[in-house]
Amino acid sequence: MADKITAKDAAEKKDGFVLIDVREADEIAQDGTIEGAVNIPLGQLIRKGRQGELDDLKGKTICTYCNGGYRGNIGADELNKKGFTAVTIDGGYAAWKEEKKKNTK
């Protein structure tokens, strides 16, 4: 199981991560994404569909997320198995949006 970080910690350390949104494009179109995140759907992440792009991220800390956390955790696990350093946002994009609401009040 991948290490999890809170949405608050992810927001504070956002510039120190490569953010990967593992949701499908239609989910992002409907709900938005974290500014600066790269979209690599979980299926492509697992099937090596974008391995060249991923290889450029070796040595960097990757932070994955989905809407609620489940797919983000799977994505981080897969990346860690492949030799990357990856964590996931506990609660996913939903937690991120909630954290952003707290900070804009």
For the regions a protein language model found, what residue spans apply to each?
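Aromatic-flanked redox-active Cys/Sec active sites in thiol-based oxidoreductases
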Residues: 67
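Rhodanese-like catalytic fold shared by cysteine-dependent sulfurtransferases
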Residues: 1-18, 25-61, 70-105
